[in-house]
UniProtKB/Swiss-Prot annotation:
Disordered: annotated span: 42-73, 129-148
Record function comment: Involved in auxin transport. Regulator of the auxin signaling pathway.
Primary localization: membrane
GO cellular component, one term: plasma membrane
Protein name in UniProt: Protein BIG GRAIN 1-like B
GO biological process: auxin transport; auxin-activated signaling pathway; positive regulation of auxin mediated signaling pathway
Family, as annotated: Belongs to the BIG GRAIN 1 (BG1) plant protein family.
Length: 366
C-alpha cells in the first residue's frame, strides 16, 4: 500500500493494525512491566507454597513427637508399678467463701527397674484454687493496715499518758512566776499582820464539869461569830481562831484571865458575863484599830501620790520656762566652752546659754 492510501483507511482499522504490530514487536517498557508482574505473581505463589510446607512439617513433627511419647509411656507402664496417691486439701474462708481441692499423682519406681529415672510429679489444680490468692490479697493488706493503725494509736496513747503524768511545766517560767508571787504576797501579808492582826485562841476543857460545858460551847460560838467579821473589803485582813486543848489565850495584857487549873469557866454566871463583855470590848477595840490603821495607810499613800504629782508638774514648768528663755536669744552657745577664759564655776551647774558677742563675754569674765 502506498502511504497516500492510508489516509483513506478508517481510524478503527488503523488502531487494529498498530495493536498487532505492538504484540509482534513490544516496547521495552511493556516488557519490563510484564516481567515485574510475573515476578510478583511467582513470589506470592512461592510464599503460599512455603507456608503450606512449613505448616505440614510442624504437624508432622508434632505427630511424631506424640507418637514417641506414647511409645515411651507404654514402655514405662510395663516396667513400673503404678501407685496412686491422692491428697485432697480443702480450704474455706469466711471473707471469700470458696473451697478448693488439689490432687497429686505420683508414680513410684519399682525395684526391678533400677536404670530408669524417677519421673517428675505432675500437679493438677482447679482454677478456683488459682484465683484464691487474688481473693486473699485485699484481706492481707487490710490486716496489715489495721495492725499498723493499732500500733500508731498505742504509741500516741502512751505519749499522751506520759504528758498527763508530768504535773509541772517543762519551761522554768512557771516556777519563777510562782516564786515571785509567793515572795510579794508573803511580804505584804507579814507587814499587815504584824501591825493589825491579833490571834485569839480559845479552848474547851475536856475535864470540866457537866454544867460548864454548855456555857463554854456558847462562849466559843459567840467568839467565832464576833471574830469572823471582816472590817472592810479593801483591807482584806483575815482573823483566825485556833482552838487549843489547854487554855484560853487572848493577849499579853489579858494574862490575868489565864487560869492554869481551868477554873475560868466556873459555875458562877457573873464571871462568865464579865469574860464575855471583856471579849466583846477587846474585839471592838481591835476592829477600830484596824479601821484606823487602814485609813492612815490610805491617807499616807494619797499624800505621797499628790507630792509626786506636784513635783513632776513643777519640774515640767521650770523646763518650759528655760526653753522659752533660751529660744529668745539669737545666737546661743554653752558657757562650758568659756572654761579656758577662767569661768570654772559654770562647770558645777547646768549649762547656761548666752550671746556670742565678745564684749558681753569680757564683762562676764571680769
Amino acid at each position: 500500500m502506498d502511504p497516500w492510501d492510508t489516509y483513506n483507511i478508517p481510524l478503527d482499522h488503523q488502531h487494529r493494525l498498530r495493536n498487532r504490530r505492538d504484540h509482534r514487536h513490544p516496547s521495552f517498557s511493556s516488557t519490563l512491566l510484564d516481567q515485574i508482574y510475573r515476578s510478583i505473581d511467582d513470589s506470592s505463589t512461592n510464599s503460599s507454597s512455603m507456608r503450606k510446607t512449613k505448616h505440614q512439617n510442624r504437624e508432622d513433627t508434632r505427630v511424631s513427637a506424640n507418637r514417641r511419647d506414647d511409645f515411651n509411656r507404654s514402655k514405662n507402664l510395663k516396667t513400673i508399678e503404678p501407685v496412686f496417691f491422692k491428697h485432697s486439701s480443702s480450704s474455706s474462708s469466711d471473707s471469700s467463701g470458696f473451697s478448693s481441692s488439689e490432687s497429686d499423682y505420683f508414680y513410684r519406681r519399682s525395684k526391678s527397674s533400677p536404670a530408669i529415672s524417677h519421673p517428675k510429679p505432675i500437679r493438677t489444680t482447679v482454677e478456683r484454687f488459682e484465683r484464691s490468692p487474688q481473693n486473699h490479697r485485699p484481706n492481707s493488706s487490710n490486716k496489715q493496715e489495721h495492725g499498723s493503725f493499732l500500733k500508731t494509736k498505742s504509741k500516741a496513747l502512751k505519749i499522751y499518758s506520759d504528758l498527763k503524768k508530768v504535773k509541772q511545766p517543762i519551761s522554768p517560767g512557771g516556777r519563777l512566776a510562782t516564786f515571785l508571787n509567793s515572795i510579794f504576797t508573803g511580804a505584804g501579808n507579814t507587814k499587815k499582820l504584824n501591825k493589825i492582826n491579833t490571834t485569839v485562841t480559845s479552848t474547851t476543857a475536856a475535864a470540866a464539869a457537866a454544867s460548864s460545858t454548855t456555857t463554854c460551847s456558847s462562849a466559843s460560838s459567840f467568839s467565832r461569830s464576833c471574830l469572823s467579821k471582816t472590817p472592810s473589803s479593801s483591807e482584806k485582813s483575815k482573823r483566825s481562831v485556833r482552838f487549843c486543848p489547854v487554855n484560853v489565850i487572848f493577849d499579853e495584857d489579858s494574862s490575868k484571865y489565864n487560869n492554869k487549873n481551868n477554873k475560868v469557866y466556873g459555875n458562877n454566871e457573873r464571871e462568865y458575863e464579865s469574860i464575855r463583855h471583856t471579849l466583846e470590848n477587846r474585839v471592838m477595840e481591835e476592829n477600830r484599830r484596824v479601821i484606823e490603821a487602814a485609813k492612815e495607810l490610805l491617807r499616807s499613800y494619797q499624800k505621797k501620790n499628790k507630792e509626786v504629782i506636784e513635783v513632776s508638774v513643777e519640774d515640767d514648768e521650770e523646763d518650759d520656762d528655760d526653753d522659752a528663755l533660751s529660744c529668745t536669744s539669737s545666737d546661743l552657745f554653752e558657757l562650758d566652752n568659756l572654761s579656758a577664759i577662767g569661768i570654772d564655776r559654770y562647770r558645777e551647774e547646768l549649762p547656761v546659754y548666752e550671746t556670742t558677742r565678745l564684749n558681753t563675754n569680757r564683762i562676764i569674765s571680769r
